[in-house]
């Protein structure tokens, strides 16, 4: 397939979880004015931490930054879809109004299993495909994401999912994205059930591609200029009680940043002409991946917006 070329692409990669400090290029250092450069966004997900991404997207739009291409996996896929359609305000509205029961629910049978003797519970867990039901997210995605608008949008969209059957990554674009594919990209195996699409069992693309930076660089072709941002902090300590849910959330938080940073290093090696940075929250979010409501969501949105403005101030764009 012939790759399209987007000259003057500025690449902004948004990371959501806080990693331990690593060696990386300086964040948002003053340099050439990138105001006229087009911008590519890469969203990494992180469950409820996607609220931070929404704030960043809104902050960029408020400053007149033109997004030419956007890629996402996991929760970042939904964010990427609404940015591709030019609906950053709607994206923020979604995050401000979302609640846990609009994203997932515990199947009634799972609750019943907790009342059964241990050996029966183990048998039950061998019969089910996931801890939580993502049906509410399907309804939410259908309500907010206008597929026709995405297909007509000038902003190029890339969404990553993983096919459990073949073990291969799948990249979907404006032309073939669907609501089911967006849900599939957020379906962490074991936590949420795989989504069957055209004979494939699709799950969270972030398992193999936390932030699809390399996909974006490959699919958009040569890049002349780049607007990039990086920031990092320390992970929030795991507090008791050590429930299964908290352990799963903590595992996801620790697994996310390492691959994102390694991919950025690889991208810098492959594309020395592009300055690539990772924008992480400037302050701890104190937001758990499955915590889709409350003041912390609102705070994450505002922090993302503030960080986007601060980054552009330093870049002169």
What are these regions (language model features)?
Residues 7-18:
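Bacterial N-terminal signal peptides
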Residues 20-23:
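Sec/Tat signal peptide C-region and signal peptidase I cleavage site
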Residues 25-70:
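Helix-rich "cap/lid" substructures immediately adjacent to catalytic or cofactor-binding pockets
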Residues 35-39, 88-140, 164-165, 169, ...:
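Non-catalytic peripheral regions of patatin-like phospholipases
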Residues 46, 56, 76, 141, ...:
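Conserved small-residue
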Residues 53, 79-80, 213:
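Short helix immediately C-terminal to the catalytic nucleophile in hydrolase catalytic domains
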Residues 77-88:
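Short glycine-enriched nucleophile-adjacent loop
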Residues 101-106, 145-156:
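A short alpha-helix-loop-beta-strand transition element characteristic
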């Amino acid at each position: 397939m012939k790759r399209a070329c987007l000259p003057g692409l500025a690449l902004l990669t948004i990371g959501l979880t806080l990693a331990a400090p690593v060696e990386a290029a300086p964040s948002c250092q003053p340099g050439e004015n990138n105001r006229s450069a087009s911008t590519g966004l890469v969203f990494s997900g992180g469950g409820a931490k996607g609220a931070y991404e929404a704030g960043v997207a809104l902050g960029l739009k408020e400053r007149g930054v033109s997004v030419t291409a956007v890629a996402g996996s996991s929760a970042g896929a939904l964010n990427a879809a609404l940015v591709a359609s030019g609906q950053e305000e709607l994206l923020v509205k979604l995050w401000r109004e979302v609640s846990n029961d609009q994203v997932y629910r515990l199947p009634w049978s799972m609750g019943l299993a907790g009342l059964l003797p241990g050996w029966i519970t183990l048998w039950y867990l061998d019969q089910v495909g996931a801890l939580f039901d993502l049906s509410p997210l399907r309804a939410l995605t259908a309500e907010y994401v206008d597929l026709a608008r995405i297909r007509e949008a000038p902003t190029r969209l890339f969404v990553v999912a993983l096919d459990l059957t073949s073990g291969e990554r799948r990249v979907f674009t404006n032309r073939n994205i669907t609501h089911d594919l967006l849900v599939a990209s957020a379906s962490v195996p074991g936590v949420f059930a795989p989504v069957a699409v055209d004979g494939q069992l699709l799950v969270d693309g972030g398992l193999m591609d936390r932030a699809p930076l390399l996909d974006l660089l490959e699919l958009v072709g040569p890049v002349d200029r780049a607007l990039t941002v990086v920031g990092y902090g320390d992970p929030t300590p795991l507090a008791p009680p050590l429930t299964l849910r908290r352990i799963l959330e903590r595992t996801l938080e620790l697994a996310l940043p390492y691959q994102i940073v390694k991919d950025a290093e690889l991208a810098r090696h492959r594309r020395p002409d592009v300055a690539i940075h990772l924008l992480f929250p400037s302050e701890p979010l104190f937001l758990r991946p499955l915590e889709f409501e409350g003041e912390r969501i609102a705070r994450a949105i505002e922090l993302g917006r503030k960080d986007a403005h601060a980054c552009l101030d330093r870049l002169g764009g």
